[in-house]
Amino acid sequence: MKTVFTLLLLAVSLASQAGRIITDSVESKVLGEKVLYNIYLPNGFDRNSKLYPVVYLLHGLSDDYRAWRDKGRMQDVADELIESGEACEMIIVMPNAGGPDTHNTWNGYFNMPGWNYEDFFFQEFVPAVEMKYHAVGDKGHRAVMGLSMGGGGSTVYCQRHPDMFSSCYAMSAWLDNQNNNVGVGQEKDKRYYVSEAVKEHSALRFVEQADDETKKQLRTVKWFFDCGDDDFLFDQSVWLHQLMRNARIKDELRIRNGVHNWEYWHLALRMALPFASRNFE
């Protein structure tokens, strides 16, 4: 009986230390629709008026804003890391940028015909979320990370907006599509357009063509690329790492055993959140 009582007390204690995830939305004039997002709020968020650093956590192609909560179990990971002191208290924002029917639903973080998502993200989404959920709201307290399409989106966002983010953690990142890595056909549906947008916003070509001033700005961001050794996008992370080294832009590259799946990304998140935390000012 004493053991059962002790376990119950422990369960109550852990529950009282947990953060929570809520679903919210932003009405976008740029996209002409309501954009849903999930946001993780750390324990005690409602009991104080402090300002928090923020992480934008991006999903992959064919997923949506629920993926990191439901498949990645990010609340468990965040609660554990914050409680242990491995990560600081932070808010984590998971915006919607797609859906499972990739041929008929817009997916992607870049501007493309009919879907100016990058404009929405920086002009509408970030200001609205950070105002409502009292984020610190500066480069030193803002990070972006994501998997696959979201890993590529995170990388390119930091390349194109280095004044906005302190760090980028890209998991199994879709960084380029010169070789049609996602197997898109010639039919010009919505999957075709996201494929073309990734090609046009190649993170590899961006570094290859960067001038000295651009490289200087890229050095103000902390970079981490994490990809499985059997991932079909493996070569892209390795290639970008080499380009960064050639340009004297410091980055971290981790190649671990794994493929393009949630088992890999769940473990990656355990490294990504402390990485972001260490690089907040």
Enumerate the predicted regions with their spans.
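Non-catalytic cap/lid and distal C-terminal segments of serine-dependent acyl enzymes
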Residues: 19-281
